[in-house]
């Protein structure tokens, strides 16, 4: 195999002790395997290895060899990743099931081509890149992987060898935490080098083969961006960072336009169009490097000129190079002057504290109208009335409290970004831990108090815990009945986005109950939206593993029933998922197409097929309830937190320097479950190779049906429901990736042995 061929190059690299490491490593692997089979402790396995194969090594030399093992294996994994990336188009059928070509042909066979065309005109996939700390590779290593995969694809042995040498000399450990701006720059690389090309390639295909280009106003793909905007639990994200990030996003997309226009200028060398392309190139160049020189610069100017060039080519030059011009036009429609929309996010509890601070200012009445003098003493109902009507121009500088200043400045930053990058530059504000109608209206009021009477902003509540998901319908109905907010929604084309958190939902209620609660919340909110004549979009906060909403994402969206509004698919893509699923042009195009087609398939090609019958719905509910009970009992076990603190990698997450934000929410010295972030929580179970959040409770629940003699109900549900099958497949993925032999020695631990057995018994179910 290619891996074995290129892996052999490691032996030729000019590194100290490389031969010794490569000779000892296979022996160490065999020792570990035997040790696992015998349920030995890790320290005993390592000790037996040195006693047998290197008895003369002192402690220092033993540590050096173990460290060399880690370095060697890390680089082997990088090589494997690069080979996998290079062969992506061979391993995956780029025109097979789930691709646009396949969807187009299936629609034609079912005589649904026109229906498909009309649906794509309004269907949209929104990919939101986040800086959640799940990417352990430093940026320079990611670049090497990219270069290495390109060299492997070309079988360029000389470049491969040089890159392996570079890899050997490049540290994998970050000495310092990245800043929020560092995280932003890291993810902008993917926008510039991957999404810019892959998304426009898909847009070109749709415009050429499915919908006439002139009729396609829908962008199909939107890209969101959280680094530099997500303040939830990250005190290092300031308004200055937000503005700096937005500026960098615009610079990056203009640089890509400039590169494309330079290439186009070499092709458009004939009268009528030549000078227009040259002028456009100069215009973008000036905006990049001399922005003060441009008296007029806007997306409309760029698009109008490009469309004029296109008309000239078609009418006067037989359409020569029109596909190149259309490609740039499509890119401009996709990415505008903003590249990606910079979302702002903050916790509702922070907002409440800030709002209390705002209205408590002794001179507040001189800055606002509609604020009752005794606002804080009012009943909840009266406060809601006041929140809807108050407005003003409150300066952030009149407050000494830093978080109050920063919150108000972040709203001003959104206004500033919209002026420079266009409205899409920053027009979404997410309220995490949203529990009440007041949580939403407090933010609405803060925007109107920031000299923004009619804010061009989508206010997006994020419902995360099981109780919050259950109350989401009541909260949103109160919002839709508010006349001022209703007028705001009309200005937003009567479209409301709601975010649903898979990670914290799973942490709170367990895998099955979280997914089922989110499904039910989507159904309830869809029905509510239909009742009020509103279009509802669901924004899913998903991570990489099934325990955080990951797994087979395409299958998940393809399994949605007609009871859920689905003109949009919106989801977060985090950390390592970005590089693994969207790290190359091939993988990015493939996975974007899969997402696009999954929404189309459930709505156009198989309408009604995924709807749950009353009997199946009852079975789902019973499975969820029993799994929830099992998970809650597990969480309440007195050893739950101590086990994570002392037997897992949880305490070390804060030391990895892979993210800018603190590793836990609260400031308490002791670990509280409520303060525990979903990523270190899920990650710690994953590194124990136990993957508890992805399966715990599911086995107990199904066993309950077996004990009651009702397993046929579960079998019938499995046969009928694609959603249920998807949930089980993803949970089985968590089970498959578990390896309890690694921690079997814990069974003998006096303090934690019984708790380990409890987990293992659930795994065996």
What do these predicted ranges mean?
Residues 1-39, 43-65, 86-89, 94-97, ...:
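Acidic, glycine-enriched catalytic cores built around paired aspartates
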Residues 208-223, 409, 440-445, 474-486, ...:
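Conserved alpha/beta core surface patches that mediate binding of polyanionic ligands
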Residues 172-189, 239, 291-293, 308-315, ...:
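Glycine- and acidic
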Residues 1-383, 403-406, 427, 457, ...:
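Often metal-dependent polyanion-binding catalytic scaffolds in large enzymes
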